[in-house]
């Protein structure tokens, strides 16, 4: 069963082009039986959960947090894990997440480190029973040990044509005038 692991929706303000209703429709059309969202807040979780359940899709609830400038993606295993995600999300609205926060709210969570954050693996391994390093390309995979390795690529749009709008979205987020956004 294929389930994309790192999907951000437009609930991660000015980071993604994906609307939950479009994501559900895409999953239905492509016979995807499980979906995850990994926004940087928990705002869209109920809408996502209800839409998945109404369409016979298994919802996987995740949260992207930042610690020491590195991204960490956490997934709830059950309701206790979900509550821990809510606590971490709340903390992240007030201040930066610390290692101590993660040690307090680590139970019933799966931790996947995006490739650029794999340096945190040894620091976080004692906290998580299920912790994985990720890669996006074959070249990246070759640089990592084979233990606890998963493929994970951040998904920020559904339709390829929407990718051209992302630099403008990010520019707005960074306070850059649209006319000054550099598009590659």
Q: What is the meaning of each model-derived region?
A:
Residues 1-184:
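Phosphodiester-processing cores and adjacent nucleic acid-binding clamps
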């Amino acid at each position: 069963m294929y389930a994309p692991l790192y999907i951000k929706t437009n609930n991660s303000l000015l980071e993604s082009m994906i609307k939950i209703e479009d994501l559900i429709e895409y999953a239905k059309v492509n016979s995807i039986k499980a979906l995850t969202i990994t926004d940087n807040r928990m705002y869209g979780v109920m809408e996502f959960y209800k839409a998945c359940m109404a369409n016979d899709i298994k919802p996987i609830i995740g949260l992207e947090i930042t610690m020491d400038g590195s991204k960490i993606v956490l997934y709830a295993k059950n309701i206790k894990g979900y509550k821990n995600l809510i606590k971490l999300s709340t903390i992240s609205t007030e201040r930066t997440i610390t290692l101590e926060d993660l040690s307090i709210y680590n139970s019933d969570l799966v931790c996947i480190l995006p490739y650029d954050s794999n340096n945190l693996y040894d620091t976080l391994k004692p906290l998580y029973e299920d912790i994985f390093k990720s890669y996006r390309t074959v070249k990246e995979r070759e640089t990592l040990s084979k233990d606890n390795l998963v493929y994970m690529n951040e998904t920020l749009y559904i339709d390829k044509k929407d990718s051209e709008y992302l630099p403008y979205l990010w520019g707005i987020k960074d306070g850059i005038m649209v006319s000054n956004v550099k598009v590659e």
